[in-house]
UniProtKB/Swiss-Prot annotation:
It comes from Arabidopsis thaliana (Mouse-ear cress). Transmembrane segments: none annotated. Induction: Rapid but transient induction by wounding, salicylic acid treatment or pathogen infection. The gene is Y-2. Residues 152-167 have a biased composition (Basic and acidic residues). This is Uncharacterized protein At3g27210. Residues 1-184 are annotated as: Disordered. Expressed in stems, rosette leaves and roots and weakly in inflorescences.
Length: 234
């Protein structure tokens, strides 16, 4: 068995002495028939490990590329430091509109830095200035109500009554020695006459009198007809 294995090694095309190690670049065989073999750098690289061949040579001009799962990328994916800071602060959530009004430097809650009791205990100044009415003091008396304005008809009635009273007083003064029955009849007749005069006066005041206008118009027409000469027709 030993002789057969040695003979097979001698007959194989690749001989043990022609094997080249990575350190040696050139090997010279003892046999005269074999030529000198020079290995190129590419052949040398083929014998090296595959990890070294895939590695990128270091270059001073180029900055090294960071891996995909570096710390900076993971930091961006989970949010920056500022974002986490603002997210950690709870916002004040309130349904009432009083918390968000600010007049003359009143408190307006923004990020919950102040306690809730500072704006919940006292109402804001906005409502005190506008909506809350000023309470009257105890010593001040209530203002007197304004007098009601009279209508036009009421004013006419008052004037007629005043005139009647004045006329009655004047008639009583002018006839002091009349009896009771005669004085009453005289007063009634005087009042009726005055009412008729007032009614006529009101009618004349509201509507213009056409009698004067009509008379003047008829007179002018007669004058015109008299002045025009009569032309005889042949």
């Amino acid at each position: 068995m030993g002789s057969s294995s040695s003979s097979s090694l001698n007959n194989s095309p690749i001989r043990a002495d022609s094997m080249v190690t990575p350190e040696s670049q050139m090997t010279v065989n003892d046999n005269k028939n074999d030529n000198v073999s020079i290995l190129s750098p590419s052949v040398k690289k083929s014998f090296e490990s595959p990890r070294k061949s895939t590695s990128i040579p270091a270059n001073n001009n180029l900055t090294p590329v960071k891996s995909r799962w570096s710390f900076s990328s993971s930091k961006k994916s989970f949010g920056s430091k500022d974002e986490t800071f603002f997210d950690s602060q709870p916002w004040l959530q309130s349904d009432s509109d009083d918390d968000f009004h600010s007049v003359n430097g009143d408190f307006t809650p923004s990020l919950g830095n102040t306690p809730k009791s500072s704006f919940s205990d006292r109402p804001p100044r906005f409502h005190n200035l506008i909506f809350h009415e000023k309470k009257p003091s105890r010593g001040s008396s209530s203002p007197a109500p304004l007098p009601r304005r009279k209508k036009l008809g009421e004013l006419f009635r008052d004037s007629i009554r005043e005139e009647r009273e004045e006329s009655g007083s004047s008639s009583a003064i002018s006839t002091p020695y009349l009896s009771g029955a005669n004085s009453r009849e005289f007063n009634d007749t005087a009042i009726e006459k005055e009412e008729k005069k007032k009614s006529n006066w009101h009618h004349h005041r509201c509507l213009p009198g056409f009698s004067s206008c009509g008379g003047s118009f008829m007179e002018r027409r007669k004058k015109m007809s008299s002045e025009t000469p009569v032309v005889a027709v042949k």
